[in-house]
Each structure stands twice: as structure tokens, then as C-alpha cells.
Amino acid sequence: MPKISGQTQLLGVIGDPIEHTLSPAMHNAALEYLGLNYVYVPFWVKPQQLGVAIAGLEALNVVGFNVTIPHKETILPYLADVSDLAQQVGAVNTVYRSEKGWVGTNTDVHGFLAPLRQQSCLWSEIAVLVLGYGGAARAVVTACYDLGCRQIYISGRQRERLGAFVASWPQITLHPLLWSERATCLAKISLVVNTTPIGMSPHTGATPLTAEDLAKLPATAIVYDLIYKPRPTLLLQLAMARGLQTFDGLAMLLHQGAAALEYWLGQPAPTAIMATALETALGTEK
């Protein structure tokens, strides 16, 4: 942590709640490693205070900030510009300054793709099942579309919300499945992505797919759970027991954060330092 002075530059993250964010740990480790007089702090911003908070961050000369739940979509009207990618996703998670004012972009797509790009898959032959239809699912759909995946299935509990989610992607053919139908396509699925909070601490005994469900997947399938606490989730434990390749959400958190830092600083982020900081922060959380 740098010695705070009148020259210290400010970065941060806004959300509600915000007390459990791991972003300060990885960003401050990176800033210290780079020898920069910056500090990254969390800001608890309630939805009804979002507009005031954005104006305040600008007035205080904050260099840039991340955006987390529940502001990723509602922040859009408060920005001077939004990147094409963020418009496609419909959500912003990173904001930086320009001559016009605040510019919003989305590094969640990059973060999600980082571990997948290391796989030797023929993505045009891959069918994907996305569990959930929230903001994280939007980033996942965009990423899978960019990869060129053959089919994308979306499963959720509420028929109306599921239909609205599918209708919001006129350029992409999505296949909706009600939650009770989510296991019906597994025999042809090569990538399963859980974007729901099912299995997240403290509800660690829950899983969106059972061992019986996972047994229907091809032996080469990948199971990707965006949750990173606990590690591993019950879903990933069951997938590993089945011999499937797995990823958790820590890689996504790391790489979206590294991409955000590069927007703010204009230089490569020390991802190895950030990864170590994340592992340490997770290990010391009670």
C-alpha cells in the first residue's frame, strides 16, 4: 500500500453490497508491484445514490473504477460513451476517463474467455449450456458467440424472463430451456457455464446439476462455474469426480481485473502478482 499523499491517484469499485469484494486485494498488489502512487478502494453505493456517486467520482478526479452488482446495467445512462462490446453485452463493469467524460466498457467477456482460449477446442463444433439469465449470463453469451460456438442453450426458472433474455439477442440464435428442462440437452453439450449463485457460500451444499445430470455429458466436456467461493463448488467437485475439466470464477475475476487495470494505466498488468494476491485473500477470508 503506498503512502497516501496529495499526489495519490484513486481507483475503485462501486457496488451494493461491496464488503466481500476481492478486487482491492489484487489491484493494490499490482499497483504496489508497479511502484505507482495509486490506491484502489471499494465504494458502497446504493442504487438510489448511483447518479450522485458517479458525479462525485468525477468531481474527486478518480482515474477509473469497476462496477459490480447491482449497477452494471443501470450505470449506462450516466456515462458519456459506452464501448461497442459493452453495448452488445448490455452491461458495463469498467469505467475510465476520456475528454468527453466517463467511458464504460466490459472486461468480463475477456475475463471469461481467458482460460477457454488456452484450450485446443474446435469451437464451431461446441454446444454450450448457460445456466441463468442475469448480467453474468449476458457476458457469457457474448463470449460464446465470439468464439463461434455452434449452439447456445439458456436455462432459467421464469418463463417470462427467459423469453425476454432470448428476445434481447436478435443477432444470435439462442435455445431457451426452462429450469426443469435443463438436463435434457446435456448429451450434446461440451461446455456448461453456471452463472447462477447456486452453490455459493454459505449455501455450499447446493448444485445446479447433480452427479446424475453430469453423467450425461460427453467425457470431453468442460464445466465452468463463475463462483469462486467455495473452491471448488459442489458442482465442480461432482464434475471432477466424473473426470471432466473444470474452471472456477477466479480466473475470470483475475483477467477482467487485469484488463481493467490496463485501461486505466496504459501498461500491461502483472497478472501473476494479482493471482497470488487473490489466492492469499481467499485463503485469509473467514
From Swiss-Prot:
GO terms for cellular component: cytosol. Homodimer. Gene3D superfamilies: Leucine Dehydrogenase, chain A, domain 1, NAD(P)-binding Rossmann-like Domain. It is an enzyme of class 1 (oxidoreductase). Involved in the biosynthesis of the chorismate, which leads to the biosynthesis of aromatic amino acids. Catalyzes the reversible NADPH linked reduction of 3-dehydroshikimate (DHSA) to yield shikimate (SA). Pathway: Metabolic intermediate biosynthesis; chorismate biosynthesis; chorismate from D-erythrose 4-phosphate and phosphoenolpyruvate: step 4/7. It catalyses: shikimate + NADP(+) = 3-dehydroshikimate + NADPH + H(+). One of its GO terms (biological process) is aromatic amino acid family biosynthetic process. The active site is at residue 72. This is Shikimate dehydrogenase (NADP(+)). Belongs to the shikimate dehydrogenase family. NADP(+) binds at residues 84, 132-136, 226, 249. It comes from Thermosynechococcus vestitus (strain NIES-2133 / IAM M-273 / BP-1). One of its GO terms (molecular function) is NADP binding. Its EC number is 1.1.1.25. HAMAP family: Shikimate_DH_AroE (MF_00222). PANTHER family: BIFUNCTIONAL 3-DEHYDROQUINATE DEHYDRATASE_SHIKIMATE DEHYDROGENASE, CHLOROPLASTIC, SHIKIMATE DEHYDROGENASE. Shikimate binds at residues 21-23, 68, 93, 108, 228. Disulfide bonds: none annotated. Keywords: Amino-acid biosynthesis, Aromatic amino acid biosynthesis, NADP, Oxidoreductase. The gene is aroE.
